[in-house]
Amino acid sequence: MAFFFKGAVTSSPVKTRRQEAEYICHSLDSSHFSDSSFECFSTNPLTGSVCACRRSPRLLSNGYYVLTEDSFNTDDEGNVTLTPSHTSVTYKENLVRIFRRKRRAKRSLASLLSDMSQSCQSWLEGSVFRRSEPITPIQSSWEEFDHSYEKESPISFTYDPIDPVSSPDKLPPQTQLEEEEPQCDSCATHEHFSQSVSGLLDVPPPSVCHLDSYGSSSKTSSENVFMKVLLLILTLCLCIAISSGWLLGGVSAAVAFVVLLSSICVSKPGSSVRWRRAKTEDITSRNE
């Protein structure tokens, strides 16, 4: 087997520097597509004999040499020779895919937009979540209920020209109550009228009576806070006077504390009496 060829292309990674006088390869034909292009002659430098070899055509495309340290020898002049006993040729086989992937057809932008428009239209028409029964508005159901109730239970009104006779004992308290509490009566009538007109679904606005009760509760809470602050200040003054040994300061703080308590106690009974009086009047008016 010859190792160096002239006029032939191989994929061997070994680079050699040869002299034409010692290694001459005579190709029989210059064409690489004929069978004779794979036949060559070479001379062995050790024995000087000419040997003929046949090179595989697969070496041109995917063949390569497998070399070791014993596969080549070097001369004093730098020439490299290969030994056939320590050299082998291997080939790479190209694997061919039998099962190929099917290419998906590329969809155009217009088709994508049309699909999107169809999906949006289905959402709008309600074809995605179809309802078994159409939803009727609440107002129509209330109207049907009212009509059916009127048909089933007829209502008749009668007018009685005779006015009820009121006793003279009950007239003055009623007038007095009307003069004293006109605001609460107006609040009640206003609430009743708003409830009858607006209906069950509407929320009536807050009345003046509720606002007055809220104002009284806020006043009581502010008075409680003020009392707590005064008690804290007086206790601090007493503690400072006792710790410092200043008797006059302690006596003055105690006197101020007693005066404040008495003033608060005097102011509270009047308001409590008024509240009790109003409460008793409400109870009597309801009983009558």
Swiss-Prot record:
Offer a single GO CC term for the protein: membrane
Range of residues in the leader sequence: none
Topological category with respect to the lipid bilayer: Multi-pass membrane protein
Subcellular localization, as worded in the UniProt entry: Membrane
Q: Which UniProt keywords apply?
A: Membrane, Transmembrane, Transmembrane helix
InterPro entries tied to this protein: TMEM71
Sequence intervals crossing the membrane:
229-249, 250-270
What family name appears in the similarity comment? Belongs to the TMEM71 family.
This protein is called Transmembrane protein 71
Q: Which gene encodes it?
A: tmem71
